[in-house]
Regions:
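Conserved alpha/beta-hydrolase catalytic His-Asp/Glu region
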Residues: 151-163, 173-233
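Conserved serine/cysteine hydrolase catalytic core
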Residues: 209-260, 265-268
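Catalytic active-site module of serine/aspartate enzymes centered on a nucleophile-bearing elbow/loop
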Residues: 262-295
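Bacterial N-terminal signal peptides
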Residues: 8-19
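Flexible "cap/lid" loop of the alpha/beta hydrolase fold
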Residues: 126-130, 136-175
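N-terminal cap/lid segment of alpha/beta-hydrolase-fold proteins
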Residues: 21-33
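Conserved HGGG/HGGXW glycine-rich cap/lid loop of the alpha/beta-hydrolase fold
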Residues: 32, 38-87
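Active-site loop/oxyanion-hole signature of alpha/beta-hydrolase fold enzymes
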Residues: 73-120, 269
């Protein structure tokens, strides 16, 4: 039966194998094939979700950390329009990304899942929670983004102001179309704690795999999303871990303690702390995983 299911779904097309790391593809539908990487073979699957314009490559240190694991499978994928996944014309909202994620989970027959979204990847995983609930979820990890994208002031844990009076959202929505290379370079540099030319180039090359129109639409539609109620509803029910950049500690900590007080929160580095500080990040991850074993 498993072989038949495999053939019917055309689930896995092996494209690369290095050690225990495999890079594969899943055909979601006629317009979308998702590229993903995975290591390990445990009963629990940790799914790392890249942020805006990013790809599986950013989680290289987490995949290396779980390589050969017998307890955890670590998986990361390129959302539609990003990295090596298909570039369809339609569907570039985080609500649709969540539906793509649900199809990916079904195709790979995954259960006992820990979602670990980063940046707009948090929005994607909360959109999944909103649409599909927690039946297949074991825990959630939010990496440097809260559940609401906009707020009235910078005292809130958000990316943008409701009226965009500082032009920050416009800079990404319109700017990525009008001045693509400038936005990519500046955004790549901002994400890094130690933005050497080599690092900025590496991150920028990943971003260039996403078209300007797709990036603009994702940012524009993400502006309106608020999944605070969905996340707060899991307080005391689903284990939650927040790993947030150091400069946001005061604002993020206030929201976390007020709304999900049983959650674990760790603060370090800048936006790409998991890549620049892999030992500290993976240590925090391991501590969280140990704390929820048996739950």
């Amino acid at each position: 039966m498993k072989k038949i299911k495999f053939l019917i779904n055309i689930v896995v097309i092996l494209t690369l194998s290095i050690g225990n790391l495999t890079a594969e593809e899943v055909k979601i539908d006629e317009t979308l094939t998702i590229h993903y990487k995975q290591v390990g073979e445990g009963d629990t699957t940790i799914i790392f979700i890249p942020g805006w314009m990013m790809s599986t490559d950013v989680f290289e240190h987490q995949l290396a950390h779980f390589e050969g694991s017998k307890k955890y499978r670590a998986l990361t994928y390129d959302p539609r329009g990003q990295g090596k996944s298909s570039k369809p014309v339609e569907g570039h909202t985080y609500q649709q990304h969540a539906r793509d994620l649900a199809r990916l989970i079904d195709k790979l027959d995954l259960e006992n899942i820990i979602l670990a979204g980063w940046s707009y990847g948090v929005t994607e995983q909360l959109a999944y929670l909103n649409q599909f609930g927690t039946d297949k979820l074991k825990a959630m990890i939010m990496i440097d983004t809260g559940p609401d994208i906009t707020g009235a002031t910078r005292d809130e844990w958000v990316w943008y102001l409701n009226d965009d009076s500082d032009g920050y959202s416009r800079g990404f929505t319109e700017g990525i179309i009008e001045n693509r290379e400038k936005v990519i370079a500046e955004f790549s540099e901002w994400m890094l704690e130690n933005p050497t030319p080599e690092k900025v180039t590496w991150v920028s090359n990943i971003a260039r795999q996403t078209s300007s129109s797709v990036a603009s639409i994702n940012n524009a539609t993400g502006f309106y999303l608020d999944y605070s109620r969905d996340l707060i509803s899991q307080e005391g029910k689903l284990p939650l871990l927040y790993i947030v950049r150091q400069e946001m500690k005061e604002v993020a900590d206030r929201w976390i303690k007020a709304n999900t007080p049983s959650a674990t929160a760790v603060y370090m580095g800048k936006h790409m702390m998991f890549w620049e500080r892999p030992k500290a990040f993976n240590h925090a991850l391991d501590n969280f995983l140990s704390s929820i074993e048996g739950k």
